[in-house]
A protein has these predicted regions:
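Active-site microenvironments that recognize anionic phosphate/pyrophosphate groups
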Residues: 1-168, 174-253, 265-338
Length: 338
C-alpha cells in the first residue's frame, strides 16, 4: 500500500496596511492528490457571503421554460425509435430526452421535477432517485443500441455560476467511446495502483480515511462519503460506490444512498448561503481497478458582487483551488449526513 498525503506549506510575508503596515505572514497550502498526483491549493481568503440571494424575480421571469410541465412533452427532442420507441423516458416526475445541443456522442437531459426553481434545501432524495432511474435507463438502452459507448458522465450544473443556462433543475447524461480527461486520469492511476499493489486504491483509501477520522464523513449503505485530501473545487465532497465501476449496475439501495448524500451536501451548502453547485458521476464499464465516483463542488454563489471562482490559476495553470481546509469541511458537514 502506497497512499501518501503530501503537502507543502507556503508563506508570503508583507507589511499590511490593514495592520498599520506591521509585518504579517499569509499562508497557502499546496496538496498533492495521492492517486493522480495533481496539485491543488487551499486558499481560505475571499469575499464573504453575507445573505441568501432572493431568486423570486429571476424565477418568475424565466418560468414557463422548455422543461416546465406544460412544454416538456411538446418542445423537447425525442430519442431515436431504435433506442426509445416512446421517444422519452419517464419515472415519476423525472423526464429524459436527447439534448438538442449535445456535448458528446450521446447527450441527454433529465428534467428532475415539475417545479421551475428549487432552493438547495428543497431538493429531496426522491427527486434524485427518480432522476437517476431515468439516467440509468437512458444509458442501458443506449448501450444496447451502441455497445461501444463505455464512458458515461451523469452531472448536474445548477444556476449560471455552475454553467447552466436554464434555471429548471436537470441532469446532463453524456456517453462517449472515449473517456474525458478526468476519467482517463482516474482510470490510468487506478489501474497502475492495482498492478503495483494488487489491491483497489479506492478500498485502501476508504480504509485509511476511516482510520484517520479527519476527512471521512460516513457510509450510507455501500456509498462511502468523504472529503478529498486535495480538492479540485470549493467545498468538495466525494462518494465511492463499493463494488461498482458503472452506474448501470446500481440497484435501488445504491441509488437511494447516492441521493441521500447529495441532498445532505446541498443542505450544508444552503446553510452556508451557497446557491450554485456542480456534481459529476464518473461511470466506466468493466474496469476492475476502478470504483464509481461522484464529486460535488459548490460554485461562487449568485450575489450582488459576484466573483468568479476560476482564475488564471485554474484556467491557464491547471492548478485547482479550494476555499476551505478539507478537515474543517468534514467536521462541519458530518452532522448533515444520516
Amino acid at each position: 500500500m502506497e497512499i501518501k498525503f503530501e503537502r507543502f506549506h507556503l508563506e508570503s510575508d508583507l507589511l499590511s496596511p490593514l495592520e498599520g503596515f506591521q509585518w504579517i505572514s499569509v499562508p497557502t497550502e499546496v496538496r498533492i492528490d495521492p492517486l493522480t498526483k495533481r496539485r491543488s491549493r487551499i486558499i481560505t481568503w475571499g469575499l464573504p457571503i453575507k445573505d441568501k440571494f432572493d431568486f423570486s424575480q429571476m424565477a418568475t421571469e424565466s418560468k414557463g421554460c422548455f422543461f416546465c410541465p406544460e412544454s416538456v412533452f411538446s418542445k423537447t427532442p425525442k430519442f431515436l425509435k431504435e433506442i426509445v420507441p416512446g421517444g422519452r423516458i419517464v419515472v415519476g416526475k423525472a423526464v429524459g430526452f436527447p439534448n438538442l445541443n449535445p456535448a458528446g456522442t450521446y447527450g441527454s437531459v433529465v428534467v428532475l421535477c415539475q417545479e421551475h426553481f428549487l432552493t438547495l434545501n428543497q431538493f429531496t432524495p426522491d427527486i434524485y432517485e427518480e432522476g437517476f432511474s431515468v439516467a440509468l435507463e437512458i444509458i442501458r438502452r443506449t448501450t444496447a443500441f451502441d455497445p461501444d459507448i463505455h464512458y458515461w458522465q451523469v452531472s448536474q450544473n445548477f444556476l449560471l455560476p455552475g454553467g447552466s443556462s436554464i434555471l429548471h433543475p436537470h441532469l446532463q447524461v453524456i456517453g462517449d467511446p472515449i473517456p474525458t480527461n478526468e476519467m482517463e486520469w482516474l482510470l490510468d492511476a487506478s489501474s497502475s495502483y492495482y498492478h503495483r499493489n494488487r489491491t483497489l486504491y479506492w478500498n485502501d483509501l476508504i480504509r485509511i480515511e476511516k482510520g484517520l477520522e479527519k476527512r471521512f464523513i460516513t457510509s450510507i449503505g455501500k456509498v462511502h462519503w468523504f472529503v478529498s485530501f486535495a480538492p479540485i473545487g470549493f467545498n468538495e465532497v466525494c462518494g465511492i460506490v463499493e463494488g461498482h465501476s458503472s452506474i448501470t449496475t446500481l440497484g435501488k439501495e445504491e441509488i437511494s444512498s447516492l441521493a441521500k448524500g447529495i441532498v445532505s451536501t446541498l443542505k450544508y451548502y444552503y446553510d452556508k448561503n451557497l446557491n450554485s453547485f456542480n456534481f459529476s458521476i464518473y461511470s466506466i464499464f468493466g474496469e476492475a481497478s476502478y470504483q464509481l465516483l461522484i464529486r460535488m463542488i459548490s460554485r461562487t454563489p449568485i450575489q450582488p458582487y459576484y466573483l468568479n471562482d476560476w482564475t488564471s490559476f485554474e484556467v491557464l495553470q491547471s492548478e485547482l483551488t479550494s476555499n476551505i481546509f478539507p478537515e474543517e469541511l468534514c467536521r462541519e458537514i458530518r452532522p448533515y449526513f444520516p
